[in-house]
Amino acid sequence: MANVIKTVLTYQLDGSNRDFNIPFEYLARKFVVVTLIGVDRKVLSINADYRFATRTTISLTKAWGPADGYTTIELRRVTSTTDQLVDFTDGSILRAYDLNVAQIQTMHVAEEARDLTADTIGVNNDGHLDARGRRIVNLANAVDDRDAVPFGQLKTMNQNSWQARNEALQFRNEAETFRNQTEVFKNESGTNATNTKQWRDEANGSRDEAEQFKNTAGQYATSAGNSATTATQSEVNAENSATDADNSRNLAEQHADRLELEADKLGIFNGLAGRIDKGDGTNVYWKGGIHANGRLYLTSDGFDCGQYQQFFGGSAGRYSVMEWGIEKAWLMHVERRERTTAIVDNIQLVVNGHIIAQGGDMTGPLKLQNGHALYLESASDKAQYILSKDGNRNNWHIGRGSDNNNDCTFHSYVYGTNLTLKPDYAVVNKRFHVGQAVVATDGNIQGTKWGRKWLDAYLNDTYVKKTMAWTQVWAAASDSYMGGGSQTDTLHRTCDSATYGLRPETTIGTSSELVLTVSTSFQPRRWLKFQIHSNGRVFKNIADRAATPTAIAVEDV
């Protein structure tokens, strides 16, 4: 009965399928070896390259295919012969389950050995050795007639055959030469028939020998061609055998490495078992601490490690609680006060002491509830502030201001505005607004009390009468005057609109034209229209009526 291999199975890779069935039974996942076959044999690592989706199915983390250089995937069971799942000790209880596991492990090892034997050179139904289409490598040269012949020996034989063929061809060429010479002799021996006949006979004999040599050479050529074909097939078989041998060697090395790794793991597990103090039901008590290089997952409703505990319920009004503390009191805890989905105002951090922070940013609001105060404390000789609730008002209270006094200063970094609270007054560095009133830094005051004017302007306009002082800036020539129309002259002092002792009543064109109306009891009323231009240096009498100017004076301001 032919042996059917059960512990090794290969699947074709198509670049899309990632799930493959495991057709055989196994005792532990570490006994299942997954290998990609293509440009090389790539052994995959569990969790990194694949995982067990179910007990009978693996799922690759990547869909491999011919584009990656791999065409098939091999699932092989390699049960450890050193990592015993059951280790019997004197005085232990002998259970059927343990015996079955030990027996199954032994059966698995035997089954894998049988499959490994079936996967190598075997005997076919006729009793002949069968290499199963693979190469036989590292084969010695044949000695006896019934020995297997390596490809190198065949190549040597082929070289000898080719040499014989070449020699036969050389003999044939020489025979052709002899025949040609015979023909020449025949033509030249017209007068000597006897000699010619003799030469002809010799030539015919040479021709027969040449034909014999040609036939022999043809046989050699045919034999050489057959030898070349056989040598080529032998070369292919030898290369296949070499590849299989390399694969077998690599597989053996991998098995040895895995056996060594499993032995190391078994040693680690034995050491781990030695660190267990006792077991109580599903609980495990360790002799020492537990150190985890990665994340530590714990199930059920929480855990307690002495100075830190976490639980997810079991106490009214407290859910998802994390507490830090000592045996008699908890120093800090974070909890969700109500079992709801709401997060805002439902999370609280309680600290039974001071919070000392070296730095950091707070992105959310800081709320003080139940009348508690916020203390901003620095060094003993520096500013200390307290934000507390006084009645219905929130007040800033200062315990100490600067190094030498108790002043409290509020400063705007952007606007450069300062407000300093002294014991009995306040100091500001810019205008101070009180309602609709404004107090300037020079002492001036503006407000509705003064008609929205500054106080100095209001007093000047209402109560103060100034004595006007004038300075003459132009005079007409002696015994002459300027009539209306187009008279002009130059002032010796620049005049502008602020120095006229006049009120402008009209503007004509682009130049300022001022009209002076002189009040009088005589009729008609006298008036003067004039213009100052050229940056206040040129006076022009545009028109006048009974008021020709003789001089111009400006107010001293």
UniProtKB/Swiss-Prot annotation:
Residues 221-234 have a biased composition (Low complexity). Residues 187-249 are annotated as: Disordered. It is found in: Virion. Residues 187-197, 235-249 have a biased composition (Polar residues). Its main location: virion. Belongs to the T7likevirus tail fiber protein family. Structural component of the short non-contractile tail. The tail comprises six fibers made of gp17 trimers, 2 nm in diameter and 32 nm in length. May attach to host lipopolysaccharides (LPS) to mediate primary attachment to the host cell. One of its GO terms (cellular component) is virus tail, fiber. GO terms for biological process: adhesion receptor-mediated virion attachment to host cell; symbiont entry into host cell. Pfam families: gp37_trimer (PF20744), Phage_T7_tail (PF03906). Homotrimerizes. Interacts with tail components gp11 and gp12. Keywords: Host-virus interaction, Late protein, Viral attachment to host adhesion receptor, Viral attachment to host cell, Viral tail fiber protein, Viral tail protein, Virion, Virus entry into host cell. Residues 198-212 have a biased composition (Basic and acidic residues). This is Tail fiber protein. The lineage of its organism: Viruses, Duplodnaviria, Heunggongvirae, Uroviricota, Caudoviricetes.
